[in-house]
């Protein structure tokens, strides 16, 4: 497939506001992609590598701007590109605004055709670029990018620039790709037509939707296990549902972590009768893989390879386990007395690439495994939680401190006592899990509940925001929050404490944009400064010290609750209150 065709189809998808129509357009693109299908399935999400692969292009905005400037001609600098970015708001629009070398040459001679880029070429060049390292690698990357941009027309440049910076954002999420793969290769054309036909009778449409949902479920199962949209798209086309059903876990290829909702013991017991209760550690999620050759790999919650940062965990697993396994758990920081240290301490170790040996002496970490997804050739995702935990215990031993305790209880008082013990030991709280539930990668359903002590919310002033992308480009989306600093003069100042984008529906985004847009004082690209006037009530899991924000604090996992229409900026929470809450944690 020519990259120009990919760009044209991506532009068509970006311009389409209707979700079903987007799926249809994407389905057509997949059907026409030929041998490039796996690559196209990744490109539409702004990916060059599969979701499970933590390899990155390692290209910062400045390097991309330099490449665009070089392709645009000798009179254009990276600073010029950044000036246009401030005016136009996103890198794709900036790249599309220049006439690059190849296009200038064609215009000058008025004849002939430049060899167009193909999707395969772009993929190959970007993969080679990602592999560049060591002395001179930055210049190598710059030359590669220059060579690509120099062969693009404006539409191609728009989507190449976005792809390079992983900012494709054409309104295509993982669910959209899943549905489009199903529609392209598994759903009968007659069923797809019946679903879209307003005149189809109800029975025909219902039957078509049921078959479509079954096809989508088959794609979803394969994606849960593989985390590779390109591979799954190819299997769906070439082997159908039978091929998808054959996808299995692969040691060394991480899957998305199963996630939890907030909940209570009453919720758990009311739903399941008996709950599996575990300690909720104040650590970092980690997925442990040991292959048949004894090699151990560790992956973060975001599937980033963190093996080199945690050598003591690697050593423990290598010595404790003989068979290929995939485990889920957390790594926790411990003091010399075996007491847990705060989350900030584990961050000093997690993802560290340098001075690992020195930091190992300063911050000791240990594994706390709570699930087993694969053991000795057996995929265990479909097994009940209780059975998976039994397999985990058999692997690591009944008395191993690396195995998280599991209490099966239908007694609220017993669960409350377990929670009190966990809190007294310095942990975050407890997890409540359905003992009969399978492991569902990437799912934040009702089978796992996190129960932590209630924390207060904060009423914070909105002092900035960012415009969204794609179909959300007309809405403000990420909001900068500030705490009030009381001044003797009576003219309060505001110090930043974090950003919130979680817990806000599309309808609320529209309402918040209408509320805040009149208060915009300055715009620079996507970022806007907002006059302190609107107060958000914000929930959070913890207040942390942080140099990132001017207050010296940051909210861990902030979430939007509501607009405090009864409050003004002058009556919002003060930085003094933030400090008191932080001290009381």
UniProtKB/Swiss-Prot annotation:
GO terms for biological process: cell division; DNA biosynthetic process; DNA recombination; DNA repair; lagging strand elongation. Gene3D superfamilies: DNA ligase, ATP-dependent, N-terminal domain, DNA ligase/mRNA capping enzyme, Nucleic acid-binding proteins. It comes from the Archaea. Its EC number is 6.5.1.1. It is an enzyme of class 6 (ligase). HAMAP family: DNA_ligase (MF_00407). Belongs to the ATP-dependent DNA ligase family. This is DNA ligase.
